[in-house]
UniProtKB/Swiss-Prot annotation:
HAMAP family (alphabetical): Adenine_deaminase
Cofactor note (record): Binds 1 zinc ion per subunit.
A molecular function GO annotation: zinc ion binding
Taxonomic lineage: Bacteria, Pseudomonadati, Pseudomonadota, Alphaproteobacteria, Hyphomicrobiales
Active site per the UniProt annotation: E192 (proton donor)
GO biological process entries: adenine catabolic process; hypoxanthine salvage; nucleotide metabolic process
Reactions catalysed, as given in the entry: adenine + H2O + H(+) = hypoxanthine + NH4(+)
Species assigned in the record: Rhizobium meliloti (strain 1021) (Ensifer meliloti)
Function: Catalyzes the hydrolytic deamination of adenine to hypoxanthine. Plays an important role in the purine salvage pathway and in nitrogen catabolism.
Protein's recorded name: Adenine deaminase
UniProt entry keywords in alphabetical sequence: Hydrolase, Metal-binding, Nucleotide metabolism, Zinc
EC number: 3.5.4.2
Site (Important for catalytic activity): H213
Residues that bind Zn(2+): H11, H13, H189, D270
Length: 324
């Protein structure tokens, strides 16, 4: 059991963290029929394409600053109840623009919820602005420019998410240069739906501190060694990987092999209710299904804090809290 362990997370898409119960309440608020995406209080999808469609439908249920404050506070409060001391949420200002709320109001709403959760529970959290890969390089550059300009104290990083099989990583290098120059931490989705080559391309063209997922690096031994040698941190999401059939089961998941090869790995939930998981469940999976000991899991949590996109005083406070 891992309930007694402190936890930290670097990879969760905030709209993807919406509990079905909250989605249903939002649907009633706006008079939206959710029968195609929620059945028996669970999200319904079959493959990555239908997952994205379901995700977008859920995201459309949040339309005001107050809605987003509620979402962030709800998620982070539940994390804190499970012993989580730190969380990074992946956010998409593009969605705020699409729904007519605006990027600034979207960020401010989330920030209000994050602060409310911190006051209530003590949990620290930060936002990573994400570009959407399948919207193309020009869209991602605009998002990067916004992230570089919008210096909210809780916005500390930049990510690239979306359909990994569309566009080459090199097409997004300018966007990452923009946010790197602005001092934001860099991570990028790679090595999930695409193979080891996508991780290598990310290292070559983006030079991130972290890779979102990255698990298919296991297909290339030289790449695994490179990750270990360069100290690049992988944000690993086992429950998501099995749900999306990146790997058929936890026995075949490479987290243990990556860990033993010296790669810096962390535990994350990705889009937890969509994949019938939670951060607490990911810790349980590591313990029961993958054979990690308490001390090994603690090491992964420490890695997450060491790799977090936070200022050094906050990092020191979190490291001190890890074993309190």
């Amino acid at each position: 059991m891992t309930a007694h362990l402190k936890k930290a997370e670097l990879h969760c898409h905030i709209e993807g963290a919406t509990p079905p119960e909250l989605a249903l309440r939002q649907a009633r608020k706006y008079g939206v029929d959710t029968s195609a995406i929620i059945r028996d209080r669970a999200y319904v999808w079959e493959d990555f394409t239908s997952f994205v469609r379901c995700y977008d439908a859920v995201a459309s249920l949040f339309r005001t600053e107050g809605d987003y404050a509620l979402l962030a506070e709800t998620y982070l409060t539940e994390l804190a109840k499970a012993g989580t001391i730190y969380s990074e949420i992946i956010v998409s200002p593009d969605h705020g623009v699409t729904i007519g709320l605006g990027a600034d109001a979207y960020i401010e709403g989330l920030a209000a919820g994050m602060e409310a959760a911190r006051v209530k529970t003590g949990i620290e959290s930060r936002m990573l602005i994400t570009g959407i890969r399948h919207l193309g390089p020009d869209s991602v550059i605009r998002t990067a420019e916004y992230a570089a300009m919008r210096r909210h104290p809780l916005v500390t990083g930049f990510n690239l998410a979306g359909e990994e099989r569309m566009h080459s990583v090199a097409e997004f290098s300018r966007a990452f240069d923009i946010v790197r120059d602005a001092g934001l931490g860099l991570t990028i989705h790679a090595g999930e739906l695409s193979g080891a080559f996508s991780v290598r391309d990310a290292l070559d063209h983006v030079r991130p501190a972290r890779i979102s997922h990255g698990v298919r690096a296991i297909e290339d031994g030289d790449l695994v060694k490179r990750l270990a040698d360069e100290g690049v941190v992988l944000e690993v999401c086992p429950g998501s990987n099995v749900a999306l059939q990146v790997f058929p089961d936890f026995a075949s998941h490479p987290l243990r092999r990556l860990y033993e090869a010296g790669v810096r790995v962390t535990l994350n939930s990705d889009d937890p209710p969509f994949f019938h998981t939670s951060l607490a469940q990911e810790y349980e999976i590591a313990f029961h299904a993958m054979g990690f000991s308490d001390s090994e899991i603690d090491r992964m949590t420490k890695t997450a804090i060491e790799a977090a996109f936070v200022d050094e005083p906050t990092r020191e406070k979190l490291l001190a809290a890890l074993h309190v």
